[in-house]
């Protein structure tokens, strides 16, 4: 069974949902970078103070800082882990791969949750968030495509990627993922 897994997919594809379901059923660590950053801030750690300061200035948290927080969580005792929504670009993927090899926890599998754009837009509009207008959603999806397509190719070249049809019900998707993890 694969134990070091990454989930990729557009906003609203169901990465977080599937990552959480799979991590719970296997007692794996589920690492979502957004949650990790919030947790560091909440716990008022040295890294959290740095992150809070950067965010308060309206700046993006650097790749180096995010990677440091991810690494710190990966080296903790775990039966396995699932990364959700990170890396987001080639530079982050290369850095992450270096760290994973250093800590002897190489990436074993990448699930790409594939979903038609129109289905994705409908899903995101149904979430009912104030900032989720069709225009802003399409912009986010376009940005995602531009940055993620090279990432998908990168993992494809490493023979790590598995495509998952994310336009199905939750149980069917989870079952498909579990089969591919075996």
Curated annotation (Swiss-Prot):
Molecular functions per Gene Ontology: adenylate kinase activity; ATP binding
Q: State which pathway it belongs to.
A: Purine metabolism; AMP biosynthesis via salvage pathway; AMP from ADP: step 1/1
Q: Where does AMP bind?
A: 33, 38, 59-61, 85-88, 92, 129, 140
Does the keyword field hold Cell cycle?
A: no
What InterPro entries does the record point to? Answer: Adenylat/UMP-CMP_kin (IPR000850), Adenylat_kinase_CS (IPR033690), P-loop_NTPase (IPR027417)
The record's catalysed reaction(s) read: AMP + ATP = 2 ADP
Q: Where is this region: LID?
A: 126-132
Gene Ontology biological-process entries:
AMP salvage
Task: Name the PROSITE patterns for this protein.
Answer: ADENYLATE_KINASE
E.C. number, please? Answer: 2.7.4.3
Q: Which UniProt keywords apply?
A: ATP-binding, Cytoplasm, Kinase, Nucleotide biosynthesis, Nucleotide-binding, Transferase
Major place of residence: cytoplasm
Q: Where is this region: NMP?
A: 32-61
Protein task: Catalyzes the reversible transfer of the terminal phosphate group between ATP and AMP. Plays an important role in cellular energy homeostasis and in adenine nucleotide metabolism.
Q: How does it assemble?
A: Monomer.
What is recorded about the domains?
Answer: Consists of three domains, a large central CORE domain and two small peripheral domains, NMPbind and LID, which undergo movements during catalysis. The LID domain closes over the site of phosphoryl transfer upon ATP binding. Assembling and dissambling the active center during each catalytic cycle provides an effective means to prevent ATP hydrolysis.
Name recorded for this polypeptide: Adenylate kinase
In its UniProt entry, the species of origin is given as: Prochlorococcus marinus (strain MIT 9301)
């Amino acid at each position: 069974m694969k134990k070091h897994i990454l989930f990729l997919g557009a906003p609203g594809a169901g990465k977080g949902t599937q990552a959480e379901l799979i991590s719970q059923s296997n007692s794996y660590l589920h690492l979502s970078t957004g949650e990790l950053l919030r947790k560091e801030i909440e716990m008022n750690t040295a890294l959290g103070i740095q992150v809070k300061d950067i965010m308060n200035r309206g700046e993006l948290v650097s790749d180096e800082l995010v990677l440091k927080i991810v690494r710190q969580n990966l080296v903790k005792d775990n039966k396995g882990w699932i990364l959700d929504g990170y890396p987001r670009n080639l530079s982050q993927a290369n850095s992450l791969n270096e760290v994973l090899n250093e800590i002897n926890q190489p990436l074993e599998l990448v699930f790409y949750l594939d979903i038609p754009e129109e289905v994705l837009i409908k899903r995101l509009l149904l979430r009912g968030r104030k900032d989720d207008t069709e225009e802003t959603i399409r912009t986010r999806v376009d940005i995602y495509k531009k940055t993620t397509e090279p990432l998908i190719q990168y993992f494809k070249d490493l023979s790590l990627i598995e495509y998952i049809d994310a336009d199905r019900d939750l149980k069917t998707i989870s079952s498909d993922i579990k089969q591919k993890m075996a």
